[in-house]
């Protein structure tokens, strides 16, 4: 079958940084698992070419902000490899609606009509789910298959190789990754999750977007333009 790394299309800086990770047996097992699931007729999201979209869209040497999600969306046509983001033409999910509400409150940014966050990724916002695949209609179905180990390594690589990155950890799952981050050189921002179940327990009002830009500017870095284009 060949090595996993040889079969993965991945942006060059990440491929170099994660070379050793792709060589580990658990990544071969994960690859085999995904192939078996597809062979059994199961629908896996996002499509194969978009599994590593977060890394492809935001090269390692350009990472300024990391937002940590959990699972890809498990409905048809939603997931495209960026956490919280949906494909063009798909209704904006509730958690992302609350993210937009906080952006409006924090930076007076008009709430967009779509939920396609590619523009953020292209500016250096790594939109990283901790599991990179999911079975249709089955939330969390791939969480124990090795992805968390892989994405933990992604977080460690950013922490070790980059300077002055803002990590936004929303909810207990994301905050469990705090141990992977060197807070002496990075800014770690924690709050409740933007889900409708918890957004009003500390997500709305957290000011994370303005605080991120202040931190970037303090270190001579261009802030993120959180506006999204009218048309994705």
UniProtKB/Swiss-Prot annotation:
A GO BP entry:
base-excision repair, AP site formation via deaminated base removal
The secretion signal range is none
Q: Which reaction does it catalyse?
A: Hydrolyzes single-stranded DNA or mismatched double-stranded DNA and polynucleotides, releasing free uracil
Q: What InterPro entries does the record point to?
A: UDG_fam1, Ura-DNA_Glyclase_AS, Uracil-DNA_glycosylase-like, Uracil-DNA_glycosylase-like_sf
Keyword Thylakoid attributed: no
- What is the protein named? Uracil-DNA glycosylase
Among SUPFAM superfamilies, the record links this protein to: Uracil-DNA glycosylase-like
The record's HAMAP family line, in alphabetical order, gives:
UDG
List the gene name: ung
What cellular component terms from Gene Ontology apply here? Answer: cytoplasm
Name the Pfam families on file.
UDG
Q: Where in the sequence is the active site?
A: 71 (proton acceptor)
- UniProt source species: Azotobacter vinelandii (strain DJ / ATCC BAA-1303)
